[in-house]
């Protein structure tokens, strides 16, 4: 997927003197919002990151520039970068190519989710797959198969639309919640996730911006 880098910050205002020429850079998955890692950049690392689109750090242990994934291939493609209000740290949004942590995990934190409930709900739904239909409503949906799950998505979509048409906001919230839940079940049934949907929406957005 091609990326369109968004760099609206004025990096000339960065305070490089506060930490001996280094600035911490928080790395965040652009699609999921998950925090992946923390690295440090000097001026050269920031310039190389902006020039190449591959996130580059200054390695304090190796005392040189280090492009993430230069040996593993697990690169971080730059999408957007911004500085904080004190001009002494960076938020770098990326599209990761493989696991970010050197231990082979997606994140260097056990739980780096920006929106943990939806992710946790999706994981809970996935855990119900293959369980006894009597154990939960979700398990019973999986047992009844794709057609029934798809039917429920259609029903909840119609009920959501009707709630909006009648300007019943309380019912709209309830029906939209039902729709979201059943959509997550359908995505899991088809071996897809919210990240797949987000990636597709991002690609469409970038295509529209290029026109």
From Swiss-Prot:
Its main location: cytoplasm. It is found in: Cytoplasm. Keywords: Amino-acid biosynthesis, ATP-binding, Cytoplasm, Histidine biosynthesis, Hydrolase, Multifunctional enzyme, Nucleotide-binding. It catalyses: 1-(5-phospho-beta-D-ribosyl)-ATP + H2O = 1-(5-phospho-beta-D-ribosyl)-5'-AMP + diphosphate + H(+); 1-(5-phospho-beta-D-ribosyl)-5'-AMP + H2O = 1-(5-phospho-beta-D-ribosyl)-5-[(5-phospho-beta-D-ribosylamino)methylideneamino]imidazole-4-carboxamide. It comes from the Bacteria. GO terms for biological process: L-histidine biosynthetic process. Its EC number is 3.5.4.19, 3.6.1.31. PANTHER family: HISTIDINE BIOSYNTHESIS BIFUNCTIONAL PROTEIN, HISTIDINE BIOSYNTHESIS BIFUNCTIONAL PROTEIN HISIE. This is Histidine biosynthesis bifunctional protein HisIE. The gene is hisI.
């Amino acid at each position: 997927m091609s990326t369109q880098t968004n760099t609206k910050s004025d990096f000339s205002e960065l305070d490089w003197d506060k930490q001996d020429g280094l600035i911490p850079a928080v790395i965040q998955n652009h699609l999921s919002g998950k925090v992946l890692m923390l690295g440090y950049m000097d001026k050269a690392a920031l310039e190389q990151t902006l020039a190449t689109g591959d996130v580059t750090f200054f390695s304090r242990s190796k005392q040189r520039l280090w492009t993430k994934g230069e040996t593993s291939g697990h690169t971080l493609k730059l999408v957007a970068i911004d500085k904080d209000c004190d001009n002494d740290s960076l938020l770098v949004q990326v599209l990761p190519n493989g696991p970010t942590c050197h231990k082979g995990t997606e994140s260097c934190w056990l739980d780096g989710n920006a929106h943990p409930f939806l992710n946790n709900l999706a994981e809970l739904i996935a855990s119900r797959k293959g369980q006894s239909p009597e154990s939960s409503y979700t398990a019973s949906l999986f047992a009844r198969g794709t057609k029934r799950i798809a039917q429920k998505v259609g029903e909840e979509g119609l009920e959501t639309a009707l709630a909006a048409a009648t300007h019943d906001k309380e019912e709209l919230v309830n029906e939209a919640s039902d729709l979201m839940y059943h959509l997550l079940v359908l995505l899991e049934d088809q071996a897809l996730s919210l990240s797949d949907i987000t990636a597709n929406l991002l690609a469409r957005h970038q295509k529209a911006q290029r026109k």
